[in-house]
Regions:
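Short secondary-structure junctions and interdomain/linker hinges
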Residues: 33, 52-56, 87, 128-132, ...
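Generic C-terminal helix-cap and adjacent flexible tail
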Residues: 160-166
Length: 166
């Protein structure tokens, strides 16, 4: 058994695989009626699995971000950096995939490291709904976790919060 959300980046559902005779025994359990998934969950899980099989990463943001090249991540970070008024530096980094299926897996990434008190910056960014991390005593935003369509809004939020603080 495994979790569809953790393994596939899909809907929250438990999946049981195994021998036909063992699955048949599970089906006869009265708890099955209470624990079975609905049609919407099955439809969404089916869509995720089809995207995997067809390598259609655009349909699943998690897959898109995992499969993005380091160069593409760097370009997103540079695009944001040129418009952000707050002083920041582009740095090479590693993104931790995490989750139950790949807790220690890392992917090459690029971050913008912001100059200043890392903990104070982290708190101000979180109030804006922007989640980063502290790495080597700097507050950083990891651009492997930023979608292309989010960059402009991210820049607007940062510039709005830190007016005149370049």
């Amino acid at each position: 058994s495994f979790s569809a959300d953790k393994l596939f980046g899909s809907v929250q559902a438990g999946v049981i695989l195994g021998r036909k005779d063992l699955i048949a025994r599970l089906k006869s359990n009265q708890l099955l009626r209470m624990l079975r998934v609905d049609k919407i969950t099955l439809t969404l899980l089916n869509s995720t699995l089809r995207a995997y099989l067809q390598k259609d990463f655009a349909k699943n943001p998690t897959l898109a971000l995992f499969n993005e090249s380091a160069q593409s991540v760097k370009e997103k970070a540079l695009r944001a950096q040129k418009d952000i008024k707050l002083k920041c530096e582009l740095k090479e980094s590693k993104s931790l995939v995490g989750g139950g299926s790949m807790p220690d897996k890392t992917l090459p990434s690029f971050v913008l490291a912001f100059v200043g008190d890392a903990f104070a910056l982290q708190e101000r960014f979180r109030k804006l709904g922007i989640v980063g991390r502290i790495e080597n005593e700097c507050f950083v935003l990891d651009f492997r976790s930023v979608l292309q369509g989010e960059i402009q809004r991210l820049v607007e939020l940062i510039n709005g919060e830190f007016k005149g603080k370049a």
